[in-house]
Amino acid sequence: MAKKGSTLLVKLASSAKTGFFYVKKRNPKKLINKLSFRKYDPVVRKHVLFSEEKLK
């Protein structure tokens, strides 16, 4: 069997505080800083900044 990968699932929460989020994989060995992307938020119908949070 293959070894379990080291990638983690993280939640990218909208900075517009709409409650909308994306789930993304990340490799903790390569990325030290928190992820942040400018992506589309369908609740406000605009591109906003999405920042990394812990996935519960």
Curated annotation (Swiss-Prot):
Gene Ontology CC, one term: cytoplasm
UniProt keyword annotation of Transferase present: no
Keyword line: Ribonucleoprotein, Ribosomal protein
Family matches, as InterPro entries: Ribosomal_bL33, Ribosomal_bL33_sf, Ribosomal_zn-bd
Single GO MF annotation: structural constituent of ribosome
Top-rank lineage group of the source organism: Bacteria
Keyword set includes Plastid: no
Signal peptide: none
Pfam families for this protein: Ribosomal_L33
GO biological process, one term: translation
Family label: Belongs to the bacterial ribosomal protein bL33 family.
Protein name in the entry: Large ribosomal subunit protein bL33
Species assigned in the record: Ehrlichia canis (strain Jake)
